Every structure is written in structure tokens, then in C-alpha cells.
Design a protein with these regions (language model features):
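Catalytic Zn2+-binding segment of zinc metalloproteases
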Residues: 449-461, 487, 491
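C-terminal motif of bacterial Sec signal peptides marking the signal peptidase cleavage site
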Residues: 15-18
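Long, well-structured alpha-helical subdomains associated
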Residues: 81, 485-589
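Post-HEXXH active-site segment of zinc metalloproteases
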Residues: 455-478
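An active-site-proximal "capping" alpha-helix that borders the catalytic cofactor pocket
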Residues: 60, 262, 473-490
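Extended, compositionally biased alpha-helical segments that mediate assembly or anchoring
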Residues: 571-673
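Bacterial signal peptide processing site
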Residues: 20-22
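Contiguous, non-catalytic segments that form substrate-binding/exosite surfaces or channel walls
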Residues: 116-117, 123-225, 229-430, 436
């Protein structure tokens, strides 16, 4: 499970929550410079940033090799994510990139500029659907203009892959709306287009689920296909679906295993390799157990088919890779959270029968990202808690990480204009300026370390993807948010040395959460649209529920001033109680598998938008030029060789342009044809 930055760096105050051929021209900027240019460029609704890798130059040569091999393994699977997102993505990308590189005509007119913008949006989203809203991207040029470009560059793109750029077909990558066939209405490539919601449920009702009490993540690494009327799975593995890319992943993982920091780490990599070779989900669980217990060493990684947000049914994992270097100082400061995990569980407002009696193995680290790929790039999370399998988490624990250098990049690229526009008063602004960054880090930490690790299912109740279905993801993210919100106003945080004033810290966190959940996140959707993305939905249902339940006591007051709308919290302690009540209810829903209650909560509070308020927010936001979404180019790791072909050093080079990195990736890591 991951906590994403779902807004631009300017909105971060609202929540926190090789030697290569054909490489692009690069700057001489390195990760050790004191002056660093965080912003690459901006287009459409996207801002592209850079991040540094603190601590990389202090690693030993074997540690640098380990990072480099894992970096290569991650990028080797990049195109898997593109194909998972939509069946025509790779063909469309290849055609658009060929035009981009070879067109020699007029590049100053509006049509070409619109083409460039569209291609950059496709790159950013790993396909033709928006990375966040899941809506199909709308090109700012005509079919006739694209045909002209294709002809002038001798590029082939015809039939459905051409038509789908412009027509209404496959308009949603993921559609979790109530009342529609969520599978048939979703363009994501986890299921053949002819497969329906009921067919998926029927197939997985009888599929292998693992040993009793230790269920595997059924369907995680497969595509469901229909051949001659019969439904079956194609497995992602060597020799199977995506085999050519997976073989490259395996090649680099084998090299990484050879320079592992310790025996446990090496054994863990061996299990990951075995999983990629076989596609066996029991092996995946063995790997996850070994990985969660691999806590020594400075280097760690996430690699595999992991998060299920892109599957309307919650079975299929999207490919991702994140390479991490431990931030020792920050990890030491935040270790007290994992050390006190049982205290948080025992004192939480959950029903006693839903509390874990023995919270095991919760580890928390702040890390610096060295590289990302797949579902984690260019749009990246800021916090991750894994593994996702509930029984493994309960018996073996979990790892929670905060991506420190990613958060720092957002903070260093930011400004305060939107805060001053949407905050209710100067006190709110002052709290944000004083405690905003700390509140961000602590909400991320509490969400990941305590939130996702808390609570337990009732005996005999199925996994949330089976019981809560299309509401499982937003319910889990909201539940983890509520854990964080409840404890952010607790004196325990001050006792643990995490803040100098828990009350002001809590007020800051509550202000920013309500401000974002009820107001500022609306800048990310079009007027008239419902909220659909799981994290946005969860922030609205949490905020709307506590607003409504506290209305009679004016816990939160809606303020209209000079034609603008604000929300002012009058009673922070009562608000904390409401967060606690809602937390107890969301845990009950999860523990009991209460689909109807989840549906009522999400549909009743999280989806529909006040259209008058939405129009107002969009108008107020229009004066700001910064984009509502941000993502990153990755630093490029360059292996320096001696005459014998051995790696003697690995250096960091920052890419000059977003387009340059995307073209380079396609040329060097295009293993799916």
C-alpha cells in the first residue's frame, strides 16, 4: 500500500500527505551540489521535478553496484506497466515517438505544440489515460494532422490504435462506479475486452487461494483471457506473458544477488528470481516473508506486481520498482513509532475484538530513492507499506518507508500562494508555515506504520478485495488516514520527541486535511465530474462525514466571505473524537466485510461534488500558474568500467529534459515488442 502525492508541490501543504547508446544530452549536475535545480519543465496539468540521492557517494563500490543492478532490473520491466495500463499503449507510444524524433516540418505552429504536449502527457501517464483521473487524454490536434505527421515520417499507426486516440472508446482506464460493469467499463489490460465483472467473480470463486489461513494474492500476476469462450489466466513469468522483459529483470537481479550486503538479502533476491521464473504465488509469499525480515543493510528495494489500485476488482498487481538507500538520521528519529506500535494499537479507538493482540515486526525507515520505474514513475508515492497480504503482515510484520528525498523535492520546489488563498485565517497559515513539514512527515509515518498495520479481520471473513470489492482500496486508505489523524493530536507524539507541541501540530494536520478534503483537491477534476480516484474519494468521505456529524455542535464551520468559501475548525478535540468514531466504524466494516456499509459511506460522502463550490474553487485556482500534479525524472546511474570490463564506480547524472529521458528509456528498455 502506498501514500501518493496526489497534488502539486504547491498543494503539499494540503496533505501529507551506465554507458548508454542514444542517451540524451545531460547536464553536469550531480547529487552533491549545494545548488540544485529542482524544476525541469511544466506542461498541461503536469510539473516535472528532479530529486537528489543523498548518501549515494558514501556507499561502498559493492553497494553502488547493488543499487545499479537493481536500477537496471527496475527499468527492464518498465514497458510491462505500459501494456498493463492499456492494450494499445506500446504501439501508440512507438508511433508518436517516431514522429517526435523524425518530423522535420513546422514545429512552431499550434498543432505541433499540441502534439508535443499530448506525447508528454502520454509519457507521464504510462499510456493514453490520465495517471490520476483515469480519463482518456484528449489530444489538442485533429486526426487529419496526426495522419499528416505519420505520413511525413513514414510511421505506421492505423485501425483501432489510431482511432482510439480520438473516439469515445475505452474512455476510462479504471471505472469503479456503482451501477456499471466495472470490468467491462475499464480499459485497463488485466482482462480481455470481452470479459465481464460476473465472469471475473465466477472465475476467482473457484481459483487457487493458497493454504487455509494463509491465502495467496490470487490473480496478482496474471491476465485473464477468453479463448473460444473459455476463461483462463496468462501468467507473468519467464517464458510466459511479458517473458522477454522478465528475463531481463532476472538477469539484473542475478547480478544484484552477487553483491548482496548480507546472506538474508541474497536469499531474498534468490526467492524473487525464483518467483519471476515460475510465477508461483506461494513463492511470492515466501519472498515477501523473507523480504520483510531482511532489515540489515543500507539498500532495499520494491520490485514486482504489487499495488492493485488499477484493477477495478482488486486482484491484479501493477509492475513497479523503487530502489532505496537508508536515511540513517531520519530513520533513527522516526524509529520510535514502530517501537511503540503496540501502544498505538492498544490505545486506538477500535473495538477490542478488532485490535491485534500482538503487533509484530513493524519497521519504519526514512529512505532516499535512488531510482523508480513502472507504477512508481514518473508519478511517485511518498510513502509505502508492504507487503499487502494481510496474514503475512499479521504474522511477520511489515516494512514502512517514507521517501525522504522525494518529499524534500516537493518542499524545495514549492510556494505558498494557494495556501494563502484557501486557508481561512492567518493563524491557519502560521501553523502551516511552522508545523506543515513535520505534520506531513508524521501523517505519512502514522498512515504507513500504524495505520496499515492496525486491526484484524474477524475469523472466517474474506479478504477486503472479496468482501468490499470495488470499495476496498478507498476504504483501506481512509482507514489508514484516520489512524494517523487520530494520533496526530495525541500527547504521546510529544512524549516521544517527535514534536515540541502536539496540540499545534495536530491543529495544523487537521486544518490541512479538512482544507484539502473539502476544497483544494477539487482543482484536480473537471467541473461536473464525480470524484473517482481512491485517495481523493477517501479524503472527501472522511472530511464530509466528520463535517456532517459535527454540524450541530459547529465542530467545523463553513464560512462564506467575500464570495469565497472556507472551512474553519472550531473544536479540534471534538474533531479528534469524530475521527476516532469513524476509525472504529471503518475498522468494523473491514473486519466484518460489511459491503453495504462501505458502499453507503463511500457513495454517500466520497463521490459527489458540490458543483457551486467546485466552480468557485476552479475560478480561485485559475490565478495560479503552477500545475496541480507533479512527477519526476530519475537521476541516471552511469557505470564506469576499467579495461577488464569491471565496474569501478557508479556516478549520478541528472537528465536535462523529460523528453530526452523518455526517448532514452524506450530505446534502451523496450523489451516488449
Amino acid at each position: 500500500m502506498k501514500l501518493r502525492v496526489l497534488f502539486s508541490y504547491l498543494l503539499i501543504g494540503a496533505l501529507i500527505w551506465s554507458c548508454k547508446e542514444n542517451a540524451p544530452e545531460k547536464s553536469a549536475t550531480s547529487s552533491v551540489e549545494t545548488s540544485f535545480d529542482y524544476v525541469v519543465e511544466q506542461f498541461a496539468d503536469i510539473q516535472i521535478l528532479r530529486y537528489q540521492i543523498p548518501g549515494f557517494n558514501e556507499l561502498s563500490i559493492d553497494q553502488k553496484k547493488l543499487v545499479y543492478y537493481l536500477y537496471q532490473a527496475g527499468l527492464a520491466g518498465r514497458d510491462i506497466m505500459w501494456d498493463q495500463n492499456y492494450r494499445h499503449n506500446l504501439q501508440i507510444r512507438a508511433a508518436l515517438e517516431n514522429v517526435y524524433e523524425n518530423f522535420s516540418g513546422d514545429k512552431e505552429n499550434e498543432n505541433w505544440k499540441a502534439f508535443e504536449t499530448y506525447l508528454k502527457r502520454v509519457w507521464f501517464s504510462n499510456g493514453i489515460h490520465h495517471h490520476y483521473s483515469n480519463d482518456k487524454l484528449v489530444p489538442g490536434f485533429s486526426p487529419e494532422y496526426l495522419t499528416e505527421l505519420l505520413n511525413e515520417t513514414n510511421t505506421e499507426l492505423s485501425g483501432e490504435p489510431f482511432d482510439v486516440i480520438f473516439n469515445e472508446q475505452d474512455s476510462k482506464k479504471v471505472n469503479k462506479k456503482k451501477g456499471v460493469d466495472n470490468v467491462a467499463a475499464s480499459a485497463v489490460n488485466f482482462y480481455d475486452p470481452s470479459i465481464t465483472d460476473k465472469e471475473v467473480e465466477a472465475f476467482y470463486a473457484t481459483a487457487y487461494k493458497g493454504p487455509e489461513g494463509k491465502p495467496v494474492e490470487t490473480g496478482l500476476n496474471t491476465k485473464l483471457v477468453k479463448r473460444n469462450g473459455k476463461i483462463s489466466e496468462e501468467i507473468y513469468k519467464s517464458g510466459g506473458l511479458y517473458g522477454s522483459a522478465i528475463d531481463e529483470i532476472i538477469k539484473w537481479l542475478e547480478l544484484a544477488k552477487g553483491v548482496a550486503e548480507n546472506e538474508q538479502q541474497g536469499n531474498t533476491l534468490a526467492l524473487l528470481i525464483e518467483y519471476y521464473k515460475t510465477g508461483n504465488l506461494d513463492t511470492w509469499d515466501e519472498y515477501a516473508i523473507s523480504w520483510v525480515n531482511s532489515k540489515e543493510g543500507d539498500i532495499d528495494w520494491i520490485n514486482g506486481f504489487i499495488e492493485v489500485y488499477n484493477d477495478p476488482k482488486g486482484y491484479k498487481g501493477s509492475y513497479e520498482s523503487i530502489i532505496q538507500i537508508k536515511d540513517f538520521e531520519m530513520s533513527k528519529q522516526m524509529a520510535v513509532l514502530s517501537e511503540n506500535a503496540q501502544w498505538f494499537e492498544d490505545t486506538s479507538p477500535l473495538m477490542e475484538e478488532h485490535k491485534k493482540k500482538n503487533v509484530v515486526g513493524v519497521s519504519y525507515k526514512t529512505v532516499n530513492v535512488a531510482a523508480e520505474a513502472g507504477d512508481a514513475s514518473p508519478s511517485t508515492p511518498i510513502g509505502v507499506n508492504l507487503p499487502n497480504n494481510n496474514w503475512i503482515r499479521q504474522e511477520h510484520g511489515s516494512k514502512s518507508v517514507s521517501l525522504g528525498n522525494i518529499i524534500d523535492s516537493y518542499n524545495n520546489a514549492g510556494g505558498s500562494g494557494r495556501l494563502k488563498e484557501f486557508a481561512n485565517d492567518t493563524e491557519e497559515i502560521a501553523f502551516e508555515e511552522k508545523y506543515g513539514k513535520t505534520a506531513s512527515k508524521l501523517l505519512t509515518a502514522l498512515h504507513e506504520v500504524v495505520g496499515h498495520a492496525s486491526g484484524q479481520l474477524n475469523e472466517g471473513v474474506g479478504q477486503p478485495k472479496e468482501t468490499l470489492k470495488n470499495y476496498a482500496s478507498t476504504m483501506e486508505e481512509g482507514r489508514a488516514d484516520l489512524v494517523g489523524l487520530y494520533f496526530l493530536m495525541d500527547p504521546k507524539l510529544q512524549e516521544l520527541g517527535l514534536t515540541d507541541n502536539y496540540e499545534e501540530l495536530g491543529k495544523t494536520a487537521y486544518d490541512r486535511y479538512i482544507r484539502n478534503g473539502l476544497v483544494t483537491q477539487l482543482v484536480r477534476i473537471n467541473l461536473g465530474d464525480d470524484i473517482e480516484e481512491d485517495h481523493m474519494v477517501n479524503r472527501q468521505w472522511v472530511s464530509s462525514w466528520v463535517f456532517e456529524k459535527g454540524m450541530s455542535d459547529k465542530v467545523i464551520e463553513k464560512v462564506e466571505r467575500d464570495g469565497n468559501t472556507y472551512y474553519n475548525i472550531n473544536d479540534y478535540k471534538k474533531l479528534r473524537e469524530l475521527f476516532g468514531e469513524l476509525l472504529q466504524e471503518t475498522q468494523r466494516i473491514k473486519s466484518e466485510g460489511d459491503f453495504k456499509a462501505a458502499q453507503d459511506l463511500v457513495e454517500g460522502y466520497g463521490v459527489k461534488v458540490d458543483q457551486k463550490l467546485h466552480a468557485e474553487v476552479l475560478e480561485r485556482n485559475s490565478v495560479f500558474k503552477s500545475a496541480p500534479y507533479s512527477g519526476f525524472v530519475n537521476p541516471e546511474l552511469v557505470a564506469e568500467m576499467n579495461d577488464a570490463g569491471e565496474i569501478v564506480n557508479v556516478s549520478i547524472v541528472q537528465p536535462e529534459t523529460f523528453a530526452g529521458q523518455m526517448i532514452s528509456y524506450s530505446k534502451n528498455y523496450g523489451f516488449l515488442k
